[in-house]
């Protein structure tokens, strides 16, 4: 799902791709999925500039919905910060990019390569994702 108004997307390096749908259309459908995966990249600075836009408001609603349904919440880099902004990290141990670590207030930011706490699976960055994947695969089976 694209966190945007359209499914026609471009990466920061200019690669064009099409998402299956937009985030707005995911609202109300958490019960149909096992997990929510948030791939961070450099989303946080962009999010900060556009937090009030409809697609980002929808993102926060979808994250909360998945958390309320007890779904797996998965992410890397500053995804833990997005989860924090969504208000779902109270007391949860989170692996987070070192630059985002000071912004984690309700969750417990760690320096670990990855953390698994309750239904949260977080990796510090894209280089630590491989160490998280075996545990995530077990949880998804």
Which residue ranges define each predicted feature?
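Catalytic nucleophile serine of serine hydrolases
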Residues: 77
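Extended, subdomain-level signal for the structured scaffold at the beginning of enzyme domains
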Residues: 1-73, 81-93, 101-141
